[in-house]
Amino acid sequence: MAAAGDLVPLGLARRNFAGRIQRIEVTDLNSSLSPEEIERRLIELGFVEGAEVRVLHEGLFGRDPIAVRINDATVALRRREAMAILVG
């Protein structure tokens, strides 16, 4: 497992970044959804500890949303929600 200092929120990652999910840490994401609901949705999409991720594409305006390859699936995700996914 990566040290805490080595972890970066997926929401800050740039195109072609690759890493492994270390944990989901939902804090204040400025969302209308509760932290529990955001965490549940991320897990349902496959964002679980140990999963390999790669940022494939960034949106044109504000680099949002991002397209992320998670295992064998491609998922579009807002950077705001991706901030809860810590990768290393």
Question: PLM features: residue spans?
Answer:
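Compact, charge-rich alpha-helical regulatory domains located at protein termini
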Residues: 1-48, 54-60, 64-88
